[in-house]
C-alpha cells in the first residue's frame, strides 16, 4: 500500500507468513522499519491504513519483477568479444540504470508489467487535463504506482498549467527507461525458462540485437547527414533490432512503399537502451510534449540540428541538456506518400493515422516543411512499424 499526498510518499507492505505477518513501512526513498504482528491483527491494520488514505496496490504486485542494478558481464551472459561494442552496450545500460536509481527506489521495490501499464494509462489521462488540481491528483497516483525517490513530493507537482508539458515529458522519459528494464528482464526470464541446458549467450543475442562497427563508407554517409553538426561526430555503430527490422520490411512490402529515408531522432542518453530494445513507440503523451505540433505520432528530422535539441548534449534546446556526450539515431523510415504541410492549423494537434487519411487518403506520413511555422522540416509517421533503427551515433 502507498500514500502519495503533497507532503507524503509513504508505503506500508504487509507480508503474511504462517500465523504471523510482517509490516515494512516508511517514506519512499528512506530506510524502512519492520514490525511483526499476529495474523489476527491483519484485517484491523489493513482497514486502519485504508482509512488513512493508503492505496491498496496488491493487484499490481502479481508476477513481480525485481529490477536490480545488474552487470552485463556476469556469468549469465557470454562476453561480447568486440571491445567497442561491449563498451557501448555497457554504457547504454549503465545510463539507464543510473536514471532508475536516481529516481526510483529500486533497491527495495519491485516493478511489474502491470505497474508499468497502469502508470502509462495514468500518464495518458494527463493529456486531456486542463485543471492544475486534477493534474496533480493524477500525478500523485503515478508516483504511488511506481514509488519514487522524493524528499518533498510537492516539489514535483505542477504549479500551473504551464508546467504540464514539461512534467509529462519528464515522466514519460522515466517510465520509458523503467519499461525497458522490465522488458529486458521478461525476455531474459522467458529464454531461461525455455532452456533446459543453459548455453551462455551475449545480451545482444538474448535481446535480438545486432551491433557492428561502422566502416568508412558508413561514416562518410553519417557525416554527410549530420551536415552542420558533423564536427560533433565522435563514433557510430550499425544497429539492428531483428524484431522491428522484420516488422518494418514487411510493412514496406505490404504497403508497396517505394521510397524510404534515413532520418534523425534525438533522445536523452538514458532512453537509448530502451529505444534500441523496444523500438520507438506511439504514445498519447507525444501529442502534448513541447515541440510536438502534429499529434499522436513519431517524430523525425531530415536535419540533424533539429534532433540535436532533444538529446542530453549540453545546451540542447528542448531538454536543457548538460552532458558532454549525447546520442542520436539514424532511423530508416517508410516515407512513401507524404501529406505536405506548409502552414500550421490547430487541427494538427490531434492528428493520428485516421486523421491523416481523412486529410490525404493514402498518405504514409506528414511532412511539415520549414517556413513560417518551423525552422526545420519534420516528418511524422503514425504507425510504429514504419521505422527501425539503422545507426546509433555518438556526438560530443
In which residue ranges do the predicted regions lie?
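Intrinsically disordered, low-complexity terminal and linker regions
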Residues: 1-11, 16-22, 28-35, 40, ...
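Structured beta-strand/turn binding interfaces of compact recognition modules in eukaryotic regulators
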Residues: 2, 17, 24-28, 267, ...
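N-terminal accessory/precursor segments of enzymes
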Residues: 12, 17-37, 275-296, 324
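Residue-level marker of positions within ordered structural domains that often coincide
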Residues: 19, 43, 269, 280, ...
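ADP-ribosyltransferase catalytic core
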Residues: 47-71, 282-375
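Long, positively charged binding patches that form subdomain-scale interaction surfaces
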Residues: 231-310, 317, 323
Amino acid at each position: 500500500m502507498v500514500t502519495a499526498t503533497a507532503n507524503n510518499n509513504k508505503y506500508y507492505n504487509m507480508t503474511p507468513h504462517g500465523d504471523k505477518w510482517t509490516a515494512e513501512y516508511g517514506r519512499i526513498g528512506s530506510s524502512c522499519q519492520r514490525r511483526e504482528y499476529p495474523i489476527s491483527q491483519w484485517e484491523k491494520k489493513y482497514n486502519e491504513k485504508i482509512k488513512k488514505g493508503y492505496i491498496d496496490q496488491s493487484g499490481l504486485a502479481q508476477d513481480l519483477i525485481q529490477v536490480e542494478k545488474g552487470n552485463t558481464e556476469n556469468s549469465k551472459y557470454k562476453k561480447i568479444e568486440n571491445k567497442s561494442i561491449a563498451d557501448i552496450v555497457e554504457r547504454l545500460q549503465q545510463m539507464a540504470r543510473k536514471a532508475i536509481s536516481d529516481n526510483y527506489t529500486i533497491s527495495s521495490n519491485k516493478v511489474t508489467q502491470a505497474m508499468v501499464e497502469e502508470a502509462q494509462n495514468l500518464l495518458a489521462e494527463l493529456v486531456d487535463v486542463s485543471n492544475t488540481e486534477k493534474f496533480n491528483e493524477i500525478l500523485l497516483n503515478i508516483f504511488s504506482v511506481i514509488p519514487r525517490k522524493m524528499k518533498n513530493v510537492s516539489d514535483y507537482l505542477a504549479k500551473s498549467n504551464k508546467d504540464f508539458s514539461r512534467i509529462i515529458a519528464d515522466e514519460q522519459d522515466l517510465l520509458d527507461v523503467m519499461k525497458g528494464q522490465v522488458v529486458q528482464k521478461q525476455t531474459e526470464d522467458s529464454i531461461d525458462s525455455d532452456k533446459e541446458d543453459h548455453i551462455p549467450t551475449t545480451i545482444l543475442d538474448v535481446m535480438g540485437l545486432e551491433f557492428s562497427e561502422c566502416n568508412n563508407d558508413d561514416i562518410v554517409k553519417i557525416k554527410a547527414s549530420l551536415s552542420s553538426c558533423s564536427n560533433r561526430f565522435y563514433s557510430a555503430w550499425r544497429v539492428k533490432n531483428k524484431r522491428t527490422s522484420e516488422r518494418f520490411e514487411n510493412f514496406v512490402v505490404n504497403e508497396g512503399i517505394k521510397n524510404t529515408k534515413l532520418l534523425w531522432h534525438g533522445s536523452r542518453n538514458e532512453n537509448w537502451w530502451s529505444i534500441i530494445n523496444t523500438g520507438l513507440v506511439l504514445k498519447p503523451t507525444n501529442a502534448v510534449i513541447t515541440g510536438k505540433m502534429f499529434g499522436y505520432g513519431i517524430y523525425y528530422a531530415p536535419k540533424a540540428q533539429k534532433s540535436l535539441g532533444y538529446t542530453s548534449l549540453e545546451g540542447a534546446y528542448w531538454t536543457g541538456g548538460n552532458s558532454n556526450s549525447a546520442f542520436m539515431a539514424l532511423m530508416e523510415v517508410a516515407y512513401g506518400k507524404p501529406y505536405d504541410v506548409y502552414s500550421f492549423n490547430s487541427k494538427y494537434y490531434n492528428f493520428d493515422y485516421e486523421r491523416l487519411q481523412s486529410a490525404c487518403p493514402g498518405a504514409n506520413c506528414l511532412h511539415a516543411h520549414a517556413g513560417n511555422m518551423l525552422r526545420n522540416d519534420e516528418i511524422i509517421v503514425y504507425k510504429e512499424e514504419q521505422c527501425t533503427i539503422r545507426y546509433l551515433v555518438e556526438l560530443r
